[in-house]
Amino acid sequence: AINQGNSGGALVNARGELVGINAMLYSPTGAYSGYGFAIPTSIMTKVVADLKQFGTVQRALLGITGTTLGTDLQMDERLAEEMKKKADELGVKEGVLIAEVVEGGSAAGVLKSDDVIIGIDGKKVHKFTDLQEALAKHRPGDKVKVKVIRDKKEKEFELTLKNSQGNTKVVKDAGMELL
C-alpha cells in the first residue's frame, strides 16, 4: 500500500520483479484507497544513469505542442465531437495531433502543424502520454524515427532530439560539479 510519506518504495509484480518506483498516491482519504502512480523501471534506469553521469536528468524534447487525437474520458461532449471531426478530416483515429512546431526545436522544418504522430522508434503512439514516455527514455543528441500521418498518408522522419536550450549539449546542474 502507498500511504502519505512512504512513496518511493518498490513496485513489484507477482513474481517479485521490480517494475517501478511508487511516486504518488491520489486518494480522497489520504490512505489505502485511491490511485497510485509509479515511475516505470525503463524511465527510472535512465534517470539514475543521468544523475550519476551528468548530475542532472538529460531531457530530450521533440519541439512540438500537441494533444491526443481521439476521444478521452476527460473530454466534454463538445470537445470529443470536435476531436472526432478533426480525426475524420485528417484520416486517422488516434495519435498526437501537432498544434505547433517550435522554432529551433528538433521537429522544426520537418514536422508540421496538423501532422499526427502515430509512432516513435517502431512503437505505436496512441496518446500524448505515450509520446512523453518514449521521449523520457532518450537524451539530447539521440536520433528517433517519428511516424506521422500527413495529408492522409503515412510518412517517417528521422529527427535528432534537442534539449530545452535547442541544442544537443549536456545540460549541467548549476549547483553541482561533475567529478
PLM feature spans:
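Second-shell loop/turn segments in exported
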Residues: 1, 31-35, 118-121
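Short Gly/Pro-enriched turn/cap motifs at secondary-structure boundaries
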Residues: 1-2, 88
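Catalytic nucleophile loop of clan PA
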Residues: 2-21
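Flexible, gly/ser-rich surface segments that form the specificity/activation loops bordering the active-site cleft
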Residues: 3, 28-30, 50, 54-55
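Short, solvent-exposed secondary-structure boundary/capping segments
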Residues: 8, 31-34, 167-172
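C-terminal recognition in membrane/secretory proteostasis and scaffolding
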Residues: 13-14, 18, 43-179
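A short acidic, helix-capping loop that chelates divalent metal ions and anchors anionic groups
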Residues: 29-32, 74
